[in-house]
Amino acid sequence: MRRITKGSTGALDNTPAMPHIVPHPYHGSPPEWQALRVSATLKIMEPEVSLSCEGIERFLGEEDSRVHALRGVSLQLERGTVHAVVGPSGCGKSTLLYILGLLDHADSGWVTIENEAVSHLVDDALARKRNELLGFIFQFHFLLEDFTAQENVMIPMRRLGALSESEMHARAAQLLEAVGLGNKLKRPSRHLSGGEQQRVAVARALANNPSVILADEPTGNLDSKNSRRAFELLQRIVQEERKALLLVTHNPEIAEACDWIHEMQDGLIVGSHPRGFR
């Protein structure tokens, strides 16, 4: 764009016109505004952490034969992510899982779930937080064989005591439908296949809508086909419902499909790798 004006001689002035610059809304603004903007940007970029632990130490056994099972373990799980803990037998994987699940206590360090420090709660308060915030899946599903699939899923709801009888029935039916067992909710667990029983265990882990799911070899008793199906079911639930899943596994195929792999050795996490970078 050129500015066209008449000078005293009547000639046209072809000097390029200066463009009109609209100032950026933060340009020249007070430092506190700029700090607020940076803070808001960083907050958007930060992942939402569902569970974290810091400096977890655990000793097992009597004084004369104590084992240093965990040596300052730190970890964090973000919403919508699946984490695997791998390592040789006896390296501390299950001990860590039980401490994070508030089923055992650490000798030092802390655990935070949904921004609340929970590791130093006692008895009733600890049990309530465990039932509210955590879901568990074990290698052996521990279903009550004479209970129906629906009744097994309702067990954690009864323990928490937040729903009426009709609400518990409806919730259990909804969860069993989600894991593909809507047509078998009245079937006793002993009449279900191994893969179906594990799916009931997944539904039971979700009974109280936990923020975090902890799983100890959740597919260990299944054949490769059902193992993959069970893992893909968990993976889908975690992603769709923005939960966090930490599983202990010896299955390299399952581990490699997780978002993060944490390698343990002698009570330490010696390496953490995102998927595809191990």
Residue ranges of predicted features:
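Conserved ABC transporter NBD signature motif
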Residues: G109-A117
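Conserved ABC ATPase signature
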Residues: P188-Q198
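Catalytic Walker B motif of ABC-type/P-loop ATPase nucleotide-binding domains
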Residues: I213-D216
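Conserved catalytic motifs of ABC-family nucleotide-binding domains
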Residues: N209
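Short coil-to-helix segment of the ABC ATPase nucleotide-binding domain corresponding to the Q-loop/switch region
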Residues: F147-P156
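The feature captures the beta-strand-to-loop junction immediately N-terminal to the Walker
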Residues: V86-P88
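ABC ATPase NBD coupling module
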Residues: D64-V67, V118-G135, S166
